[in-house]
């Protein structure tokens, strides 16, 4: 009995020491963190979160500049609710307790200097972040923009947002009241919709993944003739699939092809392609893009989902245009476009540009790395041509920018009878040495009529692409 207790205690003290030390929910760690001047979180060298001295037992209080603009990124650091967002993910560095800061802390101990946390600079571009936030307006949704060549996230917006300053006031009761109010808010402002929360059906934006799978597996080419009926009954059911305009074919011909199907966002060809491919091949392609896999950027990203359980042919057909149990985050759809723009190679998304200690030593630089090759160069070239055509001559036309080649795909996802649609745009553009991929997700149909829904997400995407390219 004594031996068991000794071993357990030793495990906690030695093996789990780092984990406990870095856990922002650990009460002792929390109090120690407030004794130290916590490092700032920076965007383009300017603090968006920093500590200021206060005359309380906690010594310091966090201040969040432009709180609602960056809340989904910074999160909060409070004495009652712990920490979220980058405040949690980079807690060890911000509190001066990371392994890389050990000797700095040791030096402070001997010199009598006050220890201080490191500064964490994000990859976010403040101008693009602001323009993405403004472009979303009053709708519930999210925007993600990233550099396809490096994986660095340029903008990450989630709405509705909240002001984290209201969660760091000295009054415990005020903090609890505000936290409860946010938690019970039906619009779920505490969720970072860009990377998690309630994942959404991607709708027709998922056709990009299915088209890639069809090309990679040699099932078809861009101009391979495909059946073109005005309606399609899913195998083994009485359920009928229509193209966006009920009862109309995909183009004027007796047959259609992948180029036309993406141009007009036709559902029938993609339901048929999905059934021909089968779930395993679609899933394998989706997982190359990052579906069904954990990811830290260093914020924890909720894995997007292509179903792993057995499906019948009808269900597989529905996944062909992003329905049934396919669920995605905006970051995931930005990754899909980024891989195509980057010649088939997906770079790992990253939010941290650098970490700098209180004595100005760089503890960490940009972490640029490949996530993996998602498709062949040939497939990427074909997909690029198809998506450029979808914007220049198709339903994604609201993303057009004069003088710039823009590729992309819209999506209008169904959420059940009488439920408003989820709207999507994923795309990319480049000008000179500037490259950008973007994803836009708008919940509840954006609160607009069905005719306006077709262009809303693409219009937002176009504004964000322009914001990056015009700098």
Give residue ranges: language-model regions:
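Beta-lactam-recognizing serine transpeptidase/beta-lactamase-like catalytic domain environment
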Residues: 154-204, 209-446, 453
């Amino acid at each position: 009995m004594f031996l068991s207790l000794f071993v357990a205690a030793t495990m906690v003290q030695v093996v789990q020491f780092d984990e406990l030390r870095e856990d922002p929910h650990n009460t002792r760690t929390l109090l120690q963190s407030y004794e130290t001047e916590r490092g700032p979180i920076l965007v383009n060298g300017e603090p968006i979160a920093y500590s200021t001295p206060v005359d309380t037992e906690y010594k310091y209080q966090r201040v969040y500049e432009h709180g609602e603009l960056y809340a989904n990124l910074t999160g909060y650091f409070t004495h009652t609710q712990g920490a979220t967002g980058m405040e949690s993910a980079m807690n060890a560095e911000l509190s001066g307790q990371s392994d890389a800061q050990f000797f700095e802390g040791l030096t402070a101990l001997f010199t009598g200097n006050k220890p201080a946390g490191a500064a964490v600079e994000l990859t976010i571009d403040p101008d693009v972040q602001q323009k993405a936030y403004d472009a979303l307006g009053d709708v519930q949704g999210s925007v993600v923009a990233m550099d396809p060549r490096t994986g660095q996230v340029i903008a990450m917006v989630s709405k509705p947002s909240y002001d984290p300053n209201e969660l760091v006031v000295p009054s415990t009761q005020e903090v609890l009241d505000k936290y409860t109010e946010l938690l019970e808010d039906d619009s779920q402002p505490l969720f970072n919709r860009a990377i998690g929360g309630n994942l959404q059906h991607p709708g027709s934006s998922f056709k990009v993944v299915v088209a890639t799978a069809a090309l990679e597996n040699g099932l078809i080419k861009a101009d391979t003739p495909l059946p073109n009926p005005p309606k399609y009954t899913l195998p083994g059911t009485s359920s009928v699939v229509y193209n966006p305009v009920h009862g109309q074919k995909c183009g004027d011909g007796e047959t259609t092809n992948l180029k036309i199907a993406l141009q007009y966002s036709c559902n029938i060809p993609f339901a048929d392609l999905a059934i021909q491919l089968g779930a395993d091949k679609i899933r394998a392609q989706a997982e190359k893009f990052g579906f069904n896999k954990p990811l830290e950027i260093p914020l924890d990203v909720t894995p997007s989902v292509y179903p792993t359980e057995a499906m019948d042919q009808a269900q597989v057909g529905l996944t062909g245009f992003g329905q049934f149990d396919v669920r995605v985050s905006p970051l995931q759809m930005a990754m899909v476009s980024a891989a195509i723009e980057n010649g088939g190679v997906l770079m790992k998304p990253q939010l941290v540009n650098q970490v700098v200690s209180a004595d100005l030593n760089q503890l960490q630089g940009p972490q640029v790395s490949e996530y993996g090759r998602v498709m062949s160069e040939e497939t990427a070239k074909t997909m690029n041509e198809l998506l450029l055509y979808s914007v220049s001559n198709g339903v994604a036309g609201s993303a057009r920018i004069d003088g710039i080649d823009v590729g992309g795909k819209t999506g209008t996802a169904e959420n059940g009878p009488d439920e408003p649609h989820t709207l999507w745009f994923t795309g990319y553009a480049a000008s000179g040495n500037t490259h950008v991929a973007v994803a836009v997700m708008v919940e509840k149909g954006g609160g607009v009529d069905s005719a306006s829904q077709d262009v809303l997400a693409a219009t937002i995407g176009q504004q964000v692409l322009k914001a990056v390219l015009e700098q």
